[in-house]
Amino acid sequence: MILFNNLFLTLRATLKSLADGKIWFYLFVPTLLALFVWVLLLIFSLGALSEKLMDAPPLSLMVAWGMISLAKMLALISGWISITGLSYLIGLLVTSIFILPLLLKHIGKTQYADLVFAGNSFWGSTALYSCWVIFLYVLLWVLTLPLWFVPGFALILPLILMAWLNYKTYTFEILADFATSAEKKEILQKHFLSLFLLGLLLSLVAHLPILCLFAPGITALAFSHYVLLALKELRGDAILSVEVQNK
């Protein structure tokens, strides 16, 4: 029940934030960039990418067996998915490096004014961390490619990998700004399952047409609310504990 309550509070806070016009600016910047990249790649790269996929196994085997139409269709679908994924990664990178700090500063002042910035992060470390996590995500994606041909895995693996990407990128960067080392450790231990589930739910959004372009900004906003709500709860419990001990 606690897990679903935390997710419900996060959803409610996220929807409430959408009434703020400035929030939409933070959502649209990565969306427009991702859309621009997506359209360019679809126009100039989809054909060439599909041809290369046709020349590589297992599609090349399908062509050799005479299933040319099916191979072409699968090549186009695979190319479209790859381009959409790349556009999402670019949007996520821009969001995590440039938009998230501004978003945190804004909602920190407007909705979490009582929370103190207790972290010690700086812009350079955030940028390097985001690039490192995306590199690991791509590496995991490549290493698990053979599993995609196992029935059902092609649907499950992309969601799990993106859930991990969302969790690692946003949770750690938000905690780096607001939380002390002890607070980071406690929140990551106590809320891991909820945060991963949040990443999984938002990875579904990232795989939906059109909505996928808004996914980086929406994901950053939702994770910001979850982590800050968890931190607020943690600090409230700590204050209450001190007051009880003093009595």
Label every model-predicted segment.
Residues 4-8, 54-66, 90-127, 169-188, ...:
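Membrane-interface segments at transmembrane-helix boundaries
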Residues 7, 11, 63, 67-70, ...:
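A hydrophobic membrane-anchoring feature enriched in long, contiguous, low-charge segments
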Residues 14-32, 115-142, 167-205:
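Interfacial aromatic "cap" segments that immediately flank transmembrane helices
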Residues 26-46:
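Hydrophobic alpha-helical transmembrane segments of multi-pass membrane transport/permease proteins
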Residues 32-37, 74, 78, 135, ...:
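Lipid-exposed faces of alpha-helical membrane segments in multi-pass integral membrane proteins
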Residues 40-81, 118-142:
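Long, highly hydrophobic alpha-helical transmembrane signal-anchor segments
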Residues 73-105, 148-175, 210-234:
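Selective recognition of hydrophobic, aromatic-rich stretches within alpha-helical transmembrane segments
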Residues 187-247:
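Long hydrophobic alpha-helical segments typical of transmembrane helices together
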